Amino acid sequence: MVFKNLRAIREDNDLRQSDIAKILNVSQNTYSQYENGVIALTAEVLIKLSDYYGVSIDYLLDRTDNRK
């Protein structure tokens, strides 16, 4: 599964994959695999991303278009 919102929100904030990888304490390659759906996002990663961007986990997972 590819999470289009994960990439879109990163790009909307003018961030690189390496920027988010540092926040998550993972490699850029690992973050790229999250974004492309190669590696499943853990609950911990989803919570960190949701808190960082101020959006709901459902938004990150493309389950809604509502950011909150």
Where on the chain are the PLM-derived regions?
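DNA major-groove recognition helix of helix-turn-helix
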Residues: 35, 53, 61-64
